[in-house]
Amino acid sequence: MKNIILASASERRQELLKRILEDFQIIVSDFDESSIPFKDNISSYVMNLAEGKARSVSKKIMDQDNNLVIGCDTLVAFNNKILGKPKDKKDAFEMLQALSGNEHEVYSGLAILDIKSNKIIKDFVCTKVKFSKLTSLQIEKYVNTGDPMDKAGAYGIQGKAGVFVENINGCYYNVVGLPLNKLNSMLMEMGVNL
């Protein structure tokens, strides 16, 4: 069995990976996301960010044998504009106000790197999420919980903001931050059967 390393500090990703893998390591990536400029293709961009994270972590590993590094990045897009993590409460409020009553996309890029062979596979998942119409009071109360501040698009579907979601089309786990079905098929492609 290969050693699996998750290149992420995200507790949500760690919790999700524990659902399908009993044994893995966590090494936080120090990849500078601003080193990859966004042009106009969100799926390519998110896969390149995931690869950057995986490669960044691979450089920290002394024992090159038998290690696979999983890099992942999740972005929220609305009207082909990327909504990252909010800078402050005002930014979070404005993001949620824009998403209110509208459909947006959540993209996750995945990259799995075999350190020894330098083989890498990349893919992405896109899930469409439709929010109900939200009142200013609902948004303000949610923003004041602090929950949106560390999340792309200023919300976490698995928390209090789950009530904002009218429907989703695609992978729920993608919206949380780690598309398990896609990850499983990619791990199988790299010789790991769960």
Swiss-Prot record:
One annotated GO biological process: nucleotide metabolic process
UniProt subcellular location: Cytoplasm
Record's keyword terms, sorted: Cytoplasm, Hydrolase, Nucleotide metabolism
Annotated catalytic residues: D73
Hydrolase listed as a keyword: yes
HAMAP family to which the protein is assigned, alphabetical: Maf (MF_00528)
Protein name: dTTP/UTP pyrophosphatase
